[in-house]
Amino acid sequence: MTPRSLWGSGSGLDQRLLDLTAADDRPWDSRLLRWDILGSLGHIEGLRASGLLSARDHARLRQGLRRALVAAEQGAVALRPEDEDVHTAVEQWLTRRLPGLGERLHTGRSRNDQIACDLRLYLKDRLLTLQADALDLVDALLVFARAHQKVLWPGYTHQRRAMPSSVGLWAGAYAEGLLDTIESLPELWTRVDRSPLGSAAGYGVPLPLRREAAAQALGFAGLDRNVATVQGGRGKLEAAVLFWCTQLGHELARLAQDVILYSAEEFGYLTLPHELATGSSIMPHKRNPDLFELTRGRAAALDGDLSSVLQLKSKLSSGYHRDFQLLKEPLMRGIDRTESMLASMGAAVPQLTVNRERCAAGLGSGALATDEVMRRVEKGSAFRVAYREVADTLGRGEAVAPPSASRIVARRRSTGGLGDLGLTAAAARSRAARRWNGQERGRFERAMARLAGRGPRGGRRGR
């Protein structure tokens, strides 16, 4: 028996066409099931406010959709092999239980604005979860930095020892680097937090839709006002989200690379606990940093997810194209990668051990050369003269007298330096970002709870 679609006259589809257009998409489409039902609950609020749905029909549809939501959470609603997409699965489930009335659900709506709405609800949920996970890692790094702020080790330029640094400065730098990306989410959020409903296929509908009512019911801050921009922006929004993820990914990849390098026997600054290292099937002494290597690799793969989206959207004319369906996989896969990296690194950082003796030994005479130059400058030498004198000393193979660790720190009291890491200010930034996250999570969950007819879930969600 050939499946039937929501479009056309209801004639059967060739199974080969369905396989080509839908089979690979179902695993990704299935993730939108909850959001499709909630989006439909918001849509019928707009229909009721527009006078396109009677109070009685609205109440029955709302009850049916709420039952669908419960059934979906219990696994009783799912995409079947004969369903073309998540929208088909939900509408046909509803229509089987509310014959005639279920067929009113799609009034004033296209699958084009429907999927755009589903994706934005999905993105709001996932972005808030990713930001919270990133803040957990920031806080772990700040705790690590505070615990080791006076442990000196060499700082590197060109992968060569350069000047004194500290474990605290290193960890604090990664915390602030992550915060820079975390704090950019509110700007991206303004683009996600706009309702596309009512734009239909991209040109609106000849009905008196009150688009604002559906947007308000779904907790969106506003509308994508121009109906054509909803489809024109497909791929653009996904790319913006993945770019935000790649910025987190790049920071995590650099952090992972440092841990891999500094935990190698040749450095020995950091030690991985047994719980974070794997072994070899042939070499019994090995403790491999697989977690960090795979974080580095996933960050590279995340770049590929962004590239896929950019390539898919870059050469299309205005209006809707079926190519847009292929945006879901790299988007969701990229978000999955980001979540996995944040979770693993957040768990790993507190378990790293610092070898103070190896760190101190790593400084060496070369890394202290600039300190000697500045010591002579403070005594009255011109900088360039002092620079040449120290260079000549080192060139003859002679070492410069090393200052004490306390002296090294004491001479670096400028804001953000070894003697003043600014960890309190970074922690304040983290708390501010958490407050924003909590406010937006609360607003989002309250809107979803009202639609579902239940109390807000609270906490984090995902997938």
Predicted segments with their positions:
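A helix-coil-helix interface module used to build multimeric assemblies
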Residues: 1-204, 209-216, 278-279, 292-294, ...
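Glycine-rich cofactor/substrate-binding loops
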Residues: 1-39, 97-101, 283-463
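Short, well-ordered beta-strand elements within core beta-sheets of diverse protein domains
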Residues: 43-53, 169, 239-247, 371-379
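Charged/polar positions within long, soluble alpha-helices
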Residues: 45, 49, 70-77, 95, ...
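Residue-level detector of short coil/turn "hinge" positions at structural boundaries
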Residues: 54-55, 222, 383, 400
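A general structural motif at alpha-helix termini
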Residues: 61-65, 218, 263, 274-276, ...
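Charged, flexible cofactor/metal-binding loops and thiol motifs
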Residues: 119-120, 124, 131-132, 146, ...
